[in-house]
Design a protein with these regions (language model features):
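Vicinal oxygen chelate
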Residues: 1-32, 36-48, 73-110
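Mid-chain, well-packed structural core segment of small domains
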Residues: 51-80
Length: 110
């Protein structure tokens, strides 16, 4: 497991906004800073759990998403928000955690 980013929900505008209409959210690029901070503003009709839309989450890259989900409280089932990436969210101690698997692990994991 490798740290990827922290996603911080906000209702305010932020620098470098990227609209993602298919996901019903606006984000910043977490790769444009050394700490992986990603701002996230969810659109009114975004179909995500309240926990994900209101509480910051930490995201980790995993080699095997299905194995990482065993025994976890899955709150967003595995899905593919972009080409080459599968993600799921779990709840751990009241906080959302994003698990990410790149289809081609050499692309991101080192």
């Amino acid at each position: 497991m490798k740290y990827s980013h922290i996603g911080i929900p906000t209702t305010s505008a932020f620098e470098g906004e990227i609209d993602l209409p298919e996901l019903k959210m606006t984000v910043s690029d977490h790769e444009n800073n050394p700490f992986g901070i990603q701002w996230q503003r969810y659109w009114e009709d975004a179909p995500y759990p309240h926990l994900v839309k209101t509480v910051p989450h930490v995201a980790f890259e995993v080699d095997d998403l299905n194995a990482a989900l065993i025994g976890q409280n899955v709150i967003i089932r595995p899905n593919s928000p972009s080409d080459g990436l599968i993600v799921a969210f779990i709840e751990v101690g009241g906080a959302p955690v994003e698990l990410m698997q790149y289809i081609d692990p050499e692309e991101k994991l080192s």
